[in-house]
């Protein structure tokens, strides 16, 4: 659907699991003081190991993405006489991707970003110590065809650090221990996924595994039509309707819901979970994960910016939008920035997150049925944490699903990422979710102080690393730690995103414009 002079929801770039969106207003991080007289610690025996890039190109989804991308350079390529000046509001991945494809099609794209950094949900900046602070913890799945194709076209595939084909979970009932789904090379989907689950002996019993499979068979046979029909059900309602074991919720679905939408499974539409599962189950390398080898600003956003600028486009930072000024007939006359500058273009694209779009809609548009659909969408808050410790914690070179009441996923970035590598100290990056009643949480953590959030997180880490986290009087949640724990927190950052991805609650999929645009 194309709206005159405005294309809403520009090219939506698929990003990683812990998925913070474009956020014009973020709380800047706080830092605990460094302990410069800390004792010397032994280096970790764990060595970062990257794996060869999987064959992500050999899927129908990738081929389709590649064909669509190539069409901008060929069949959709504008004649020089038809070249248009396009203003893009928002410099997240959506805005950068939109500018890239418009440049391929021969148009002049200019991005107007409100903040002083690009990337939106993948933005990053340096603190006073020179350490990088990221808006969100991101990984890249093999089943992200648009992003994989983008990396190929930008010639930056070598910046992805592919990890072993596994999914790693913390064991709630066995603090300090982990278990995994191991994908055996050479076995095609969906059999590799099924075998990985069958081989794991710590999460579900064999009867529970057998009981889980039948409700998912219609998804494989009927595909998206069955998936879309489940939108009226939450994850937990779907489980009970189809007789799935209750423990599948505790063992798997809670982790999936919090990773996909920062929300508890009793609040999340089953369509979201089934859509992800269907993609992963149908692509042999779909669940293999990669980390970016450094900060997202330099390693991802900069090559996208360079690509656009080399083709005549431009990027404007610190250029927040004040108003979309319309003509009497409702068409756009110009954009008005907060600086007072007027921006005139032939076409205008919104690459803003839904809550910002709702605030910026001109009065003439607000009662249009198309835009009224935005009323149904509300962003979910999420918090991203960086925590530097004075020594190495027990770590894995991978993403970990914490299965914690407060934490979604985390990674020891000193092990998983080349730029952040440190043989002596751990730096954990964690996604704190759910953090509001809307998402199923009991506490509005977005309204809490940074110190309260970190203290609660230290309590969860004490459970995950019971023999390693020290009893530290700075953090009351660690007061029950025994004498063996030695690791203390040196520094932290707290990045709050009050409005993140929209809440995909049951019954909203068929009503909203995003489902219409994707069909």
Stretches found by the model and what they are:
Residues 83-111:
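N-terminal Rossmann-like FAD-binding beta1-loop-alpha1 element of flavoenzymes
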Residues 103-128:
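Glycine-rich FAD pyrophosphate-binding loop
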Residues 49-75, 397-401, 406-519:
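Conserved flavin/dinucleotide-binding core of flavoenzymes
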Residues 60, 82, 319-441, 451-465:
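Mid-domain catalytic core of redox enzymes
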Residues 274-347, 351:
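Helical element adjacent to the flavin cofactor pocket in flavoenzyme catalytic cores
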Residues 120-143, 220-221:
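Glycine-rich active-site loop/strand segments that organize a redox cofactor
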Residues 1-33:
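N-terminal chloroplast transit peptides
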Residues 147-148, 152-153, 157-274, 282:
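Mobile amphipathic helical/loop "lid" adjacent to a hydrophobic cofactor/ligand pocket
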